[in-house]
Amino acid sequence: MLKFDNLILASSSEQRLSLLEQIGVIPGQVVSPDIDEVVLKKELPKVYSIRIAKEKGTKVRVLYPDKFILSADTVVCCGRRVLPKAETEEQALECIRLISGRRHRVYTTVCLYTPYNKLHCRNVMTIVKFKHLSMQEINSYIMSGQWKGKSGACSIQTSAGKFVLSINGSYSSVIGLPLYETYSILSQYFSI
């Protein structure tokens, strides 16, 4: 694994850092961008994911204009409805009930800002199908607390993985970073 001193990961997600390590990349620094992640009125999930990923990168780029800034955002949606990053048991319960027994879409956008004023963005859509969950399964998952801060109250790399019937698309994207697209962007500037 190589440490890239001029690469900053604009994220507070431990999963994204771990996924980067899977492709042999250790950023020189990790900076948690503090932005308002409110969904705009009538904003579609894909557009929201792209906007938030760009805003995260822009926020950090202002502080480090001479560095490469990697940012990402993952959104879970049912239809056109963006599900929140669950902060309360009530939010988590509502999200899990919505995706129980249904297909839902997960959009992840990855962006790389370069010191040369270039921006590379890729958006990946993955369809995930959950089994129909009993109230006992839902309550058990809620009690685990594994939903906290997770988009759509779901973290498939934890015990929620046992509820997944199928994934059509990128597994790593659902966790938080599409590895193929991230590698493709980074390899234009770094020897990975």
UniProtKB/Swiss-Prot annotation:
UniProt-listed Enzyme Commission number(s): 3.6.1.9
Catalytic activity field: a ribonucleoside 5'-triphosphate + H2O = a ribonucleoside 5'-phosphate + diphosphate + H(+); a 2'-deoxyribonucleoside 5'-triphosphate + H2O = a 2'-deoxyribonucleoside 5'-phosphate + diphosphate + H(+)
Catalytic residues of the enzyme: 73
InterPro entries named among the record's database cross-references: ITPase-like_fam, Maf-like
Enzyme class at the top of the EC tree: hydrolase
Compartments reported by the entry: Cytoplasm
Annotated GO CC locations: cytoplasm
Superkingdom, natural source: Bacteria
Record keyword Nucleus present: no
Annotated SUPFAM superfamilies: ITPase-like
Cofactors named for this entry: a divalent metal cation
GO molecular function (one): nucleoside triphosphate diphosphatase activity
Keyword annotations of the record: Cytoplasm, Hydrolase, Nucleotide metabolism
UniProt family annotation: Belongs to the Maf family.
Known function: Nucleoside triphosphate pyrophosphatase. May have a dual role in cell division arrest and in preventing the incorporation of modified nucleotides into cellular nucleic acids.
Record-given protein name: Nucleoside triphosphate pyrophosphatase
